[in-house]
Design a protein with these regions (language model features):
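Positively charged, amphipathic and often flexible ligand-engagement surfaces
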Residues: 1-208
Length: 208
């Protein structure tokens, strides 16, 4: 959430300079494109990677706490919202942030979490055709996006895009995962959700 961002970055900074982790490039961080601060957080992460002389794994998501962020801002009487209030702004922000992450391959290992075919294809073209292993990866939730990523993972000779996809599967007790499940249902149950709209056989392709 927005109110935990700064303390999360403080912890990340300490981890990056932890002597026992020197030379290890497995430190990662998740950023949410619907946050208005996201591009500036990326600038900070690039600077941190430079200062700590390591390559950071950065997972870019669109964001799953929209309802709670809006509610918190209203309850606290904030002048504005920390997140974009229209989905189209988040979609544009995601691509802008993806471009920033791809621009520094020596410092950032981008991990693009999306189930949206438009977003995926845009990133594919932004990254260029000179792909090499370890340049970047896509990510999807376990149980979602398989039809899309079946066209991504695999050899070019087989008609695939030859790009890697990591499957994200949360693990824990039902008490821990219940809130996570509710957020996923809200996100993908929305009328504007790509996952929801693509399942509608009556929806014209032009509108999709």
């Amino acid at each position: 959430e927005a109110d935990r961002l700064e303390i999360s970055l403080d912890l990340l900074e300490k981890l990056c300079f932890e002597p026992e982790l020197a030379g290890w490039n497995g430190i990662g961080f998740v950023i949410q494109a619907y946050m208005k601060r996201c591009p500036f957080v990326i600038d900070y992460l690039i600077d941190l990677a430079t200062r700590s002389r390591r390559r950071l794994m950065i997972r870019l998501v669109k964001g799953a706490y929209w309802d709670s962020e809006i509610k918190r801002a209203q309850v606290e009487g904030l002048e504005g919202y920390p997140v974009y209030t229209r989905k189209v702004y988040t979609d544009v922000s995601y691509l802008a942030c993806a471009k920033k992450l791809l621009a520094v391959p020596n410092l950032i290992y981008p991990q693009f979490a999306t189930h949206n075919a438009h977003t995926l294809s845009a990133i594919y073209h932004l990254a260029g055709q000179n792909y090499y292993p370890g340049q970047y990866e896509f990510q999807c939730l376990h149980g979602m996006g398989e039809p899309l990523y079946e066209q991504v993972v695999g050899k070019v000779a087989d008609g695939k895009l030859n790009r890697p996809c990591r499957i994200y599967a949360p693990v824990g007790t039902h008490e821990t995962l219940l809130a996570y499940l509710v957020r996923r249902l809200l996100e993908n149950g929305a009328n504007t959700s790509f996952v929801n709209r693509i399942a509608d056989a009556t929806l014209p392709l032009d509108e999709l």
